[in-house]
């Protein structure tokens, strides 16, 4: 009984949205309410939340893939779950559909619902999630806040006519850790905080003139690749 009660507090969309094609959104959600044994008074509120209230009387078969996905989210919210589980919610959608789903996810989260989201799109995780768990072959590689994972000091991309001198100088500098050279571009990863202006001044004072100097932060994707690469090693 306790498991049954707990599941009542969970909403989930695990596979592609599946509703009766010849029924309207409203009719489909009324049927879901009967199955879930919940009142129908939340239907319009949930349709409005996902931006489908104006299309409530349209048949499901007339909906685009993005609209179908939004209807599935509305359906999963009918019992006001404390936890919402979404499996690759933007899979197969166009850019506009992806943006709409992400905004809906943020709105739901802001109302106090915990969302568990499975995604292979790291850009998505970076944009909508506060915490992340990275798994590889069932093994946990990282668990914690997204911003903590990204809290590296970043790295510099540099070009100069004398790349060897630049490499030697940076190698002996405490600010830098790993240094890579590829196709004439030197990438130097920071161990501590250092801004571009200070580095440029430091190089110039040591007789090194660069033609290209850009500071970047590692994206979640780059961090993920680094983590999984280390795990393989």
Regions found by a protein language model. Name each.
Residues 7, 29, 44-47, 99, ...:
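Generic structural signal for individual residues within well-ordered alpha-helical segments
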Residues 25, 146, 217-221:
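Structural motif detector for alpha-helix initiation sites
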């Amino acid at each position: 009984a306790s498991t049954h009660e707990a599941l009542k507090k969970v909403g989930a969309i695990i596979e592609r949205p599946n509703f009766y094609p010849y029924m309207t959104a409203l009719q489909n959600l009324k049927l879901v309410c009967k199955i879930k044994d919940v009142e129908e008074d939340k239907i319009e509120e949930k349709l409005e939340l996902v931006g489908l209230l104006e299309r409530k009387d349209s048949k499901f078969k007339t909906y685009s893939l993005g609209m179908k996905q939004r209807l599935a989210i509305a359906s999963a919210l009918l019992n006001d779950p404390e936890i919402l589980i979404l499996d690759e919610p933007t899979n197969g959608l166009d850019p506009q559909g992806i943006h709409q789903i992400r905004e809906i996810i943020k709105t739901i989260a802001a109302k106090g619902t915990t969302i568990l989201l499975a995604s292979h799109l790291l850009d998505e995780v970076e944009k909508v999630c506060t915490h992340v768990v990275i798994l590889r072959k069932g093994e946990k590689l990282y668990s914690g806040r997204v911003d903590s994972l990204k809290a590296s000091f970043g790295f510099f991309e540099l070009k100069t006519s004398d790349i060897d001198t630049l490499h030697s100088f940076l190698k002996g500098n405490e600010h830098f850790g790993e240094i890579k050279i590829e196709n004439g571009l030197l990438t130097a990863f920071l161990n501590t905080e250092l801004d571009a202006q200070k580095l440029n001044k430091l190089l110039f004072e040591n007789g090194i003139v660069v033609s290209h100097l850009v500071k970047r932060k590692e994206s979640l994707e780059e961090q993920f690749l680094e983590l999984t690469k280390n795990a393989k090693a």
